[in-house]
UniProtKB/Swiss-Prot annotation:
Residues 274-377 form the CobW C-terminal domain. Belongs to the SIMIBI class G3E GTPase family. ZNG1 subfamily. This is Zinc-regulated GTPase metalloprotein activator 1A. Zinc chaperone that directly transfers zinc cofactor to target metalloproteins, thereby activating them. Catalyzes zinc insertion into the active site of methionine aminopeptidase METAP1, which function to cleave the initiator methionine from polypeptides during or after protein translation. Mechanistically, the N-terminal psi-PxLVp motif binds to the C6H2-type zinc finger of inactive form of METAP1.
Length: 395
């Protein structure tokens, strides 16, 4: 059973619980967008964070800024007494009959009562009326599970793409949430949200001493060594830092090369065990061996550290050199799903090919993972498979 989140002191202004009051914004459409019409893919940004951290405030800010985007908002379960919920038609059984509410500025709001796929599929029928989707999760939601559905559903994949995951952390209560111990060795929700994020907003920095913000920032960086950390007040942020990140597609490979060179390895924060590890291995990887390496980590979960603890990878990102391919290949992994995609960047003839990986997760051992990765590059498939024994599978 999950503990109650927050106390009376943590309760957000009632307005935080309501759907943002949207105001008209001027929108323009380029000739290229008009030509592409319904054929253009629509980016989705997942906004996550604990109750009261400022998710709805960020939504309100994004929707009222002058960004020339027509935005659809998906609220993952409305709060009790939500002003928007009163405007939705409800069936006699108490379930939503009409899921969508179209607002005067062209934006859309909906309540997702199921896994979210049906709602987004319905939203696709309104494609052409908007060009960006913001999906706000509940406070305890695992954004990885939400992110995964965009890779699973092939039909959705042709219409939309996951742009990035934004996690908002409350400056006052964030450290408490991140260090909360869970039973049976489970990872607490706040820590998982931070680990999966492409950008982390430390919000309400004006309400706490600078030293507290510094401690929180250090803790966040110890969990996620790759994501950008931004300090905000009232969730106000340069929109280029949260929208159009291309964090999950091949375009991210262009900036990822430089970023991976400066990712710091981290130590577990306090008594927790989530870390960021990074390593580089020169040479080419055989694609089938690379798949085996990733699958043993994400699917079989049969890789253990020196203390014989199972390694759990929450997020995986990297650039690799695949044998017989001229393009750099980006590797993305969330939960049990992963993808290899060629980037627009080619390997130069006068530079050494190399593989850089960043893994975020629990009980990770850099030395063991690096040696296993080297095995994917240098060993035969027969030799490689002997490294994993059935009786070593983690349960």
């Amino acid at each position: 059973m999950l503990p109650a989140v927050g106390s009376a002191d943590e309760e957000e202004d009632p307005a935080e619980e309501d759907c943002p009051e949207l105001v008209p914004i001027e929108t323009t459409q380029s000739e290229e967008e008009e030509k592409s019409g319904l054929g253009a893919k629509i980016p989705v940004t997942i906004i996550t964070g604990y109750l009261g951290a400022g998710k709805t405030t960020l939504l309100n800010y994004i929707l009222t800024e002058q960004h020339s985007k027509r935005v659809a908002v998906i609220l993952n379960e409305f709060g009790e007494g939500s002003a928007l919920e009163k405007s939705l038609a409800v069936s006699q059984g108490g379930e939503l009959y009409e899921e969508w509410l179209e607002l005067r500025n062209g934006c859309l709001c909906c309540s997702v009562k199921d896994s979210g796929l049906r709602a987004i599929e319905n939203l696709m029928q309104k494609k052409g009326k908007f060009d960006y989707i913001l999906l706000e999760t509940t406070g305890l939601a695992d954004p990885g599970a939400v992110a995964s559905m965009f890779w699973v559903d092939a039909e959705l994949g042709s219409d939309i793409y996951l742009d990035g995951i934004i996690t908002i952390v409350d400056s006052k209560y964030g450290l408490k949430h991140l260090t909360e111990e869970k039973p049976d060795g489970l990872i607490n929700e706040a820590t998982r949200q931070v680990a999966l994020a492409d950008a982390i907003l430390i919000n309400k920095t004006d309400l706490v001493p600078e030293e507290d913000v510094k401690k929180l920032r250090t803790t966040i960086r110890s969990i996620n060594g790759l994501g950008q950390i931004l300090e905000t007040q009232r969730s106000r942020v340069d929109l280029s830092n949260v929208l159009d990140l291309h964090a999950f597609d091949s375009l991210s490979g262009i900036s990822l090369q430089k970023k991976l060179q400066h990712v710091p390895g981290t130590q577990p924060h306090l008594d927790q065990s989530i870390v960021t590890i990074t390593f580089e291995v020169p040479g080419n990887a055989k694609e089938e061996h690379l798949n085996m390496f990733i699958q043993n980590l994400l699917w079989e979960k049969n890789v253990r550290n020196k203390d014989n603890h199972c390694m759990e990878v929450i997020r995986l990102k990297g650039l690799v050199s695949i044998k017989d391919k001229s393009q750099q290949v980006i590797v993305q992994g969330v939960h049990e799903l992963y993808d290899l995609e060629e980037t627009p960047v080619s390997w130069k003839d006068d530079t050494e090919r190399t593989n850089r990986l960043v893994l975020l997760g629990r009980n990770l051992d850099k030395d063991i993972l690096k040696q296993l990765f080297i095995a994917t590059v240098t060993e035969t498939e027969k030799q490689w498979t002997t490294r994993f024994q059935e009786d070593q599978v983690c349960t």
